Amino acid sequence: MKLILMTPPSYFVEEDKIITALFEEGLDILHLRKPNTAPMYAERLLTLIPEQYHKRIVVHGHFYLKDEFKLKGIHLSERNPDIPENYKGHISRSCHTLEELKANKKGHDYLLFNPVFNDISKSSYLENYSSEEIRKAHKAGIIDKKVIALGRIDENNIKQVKNY
């Protein structure tokens, strides 16, 4: 199982130190998600994170940062849905329905499926599918190792997610 973390949408004091500590403790991938912020703040944060961890960071927006900082890749979403022209590299995408998962399986390294449980960071994101529907999607091959669950996953329900 990979440990993937999504940053909060706003910057905060000493965020670079916390991110570095998380990488030191085994964080596999960090999704740098800072919607509605100027790129210079992302640039500043990235300069404060040791270069050895850059190859484990995926950016949501400001895609030029991928090459400038030698990052792992880019993440596509409703806000930034299109792959940049001539882009080569890691691509992940947010999906909110089983239909979106089916449509985007090819051409992506993995898909983030949200919300599996009610999402605390986005109060309007309520779980869309029952456990039974998710199990059926898994049996049908819609949900596989390329699909990563998001949405209030914690120590109390992670085993349930793993069993899907």
Language-model region placement:
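Charged helix-capping and loop-helix junction motifs
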Residues: R44-L46, Y125-R135
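Conserved N-terminal beta1-alpha1 strand-loop-helix module at the mouth
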Residues: M1-Y110, K139, I143-V147, I153-Y164
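Non-cysteine beta-strand/loop elements that form the S-adenosyl-L-methionine
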Residues: D109-F117
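A short acidic, helix-capping loop that chelates divalent metal ions and anchors anionic groups
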Residues: F117-S123
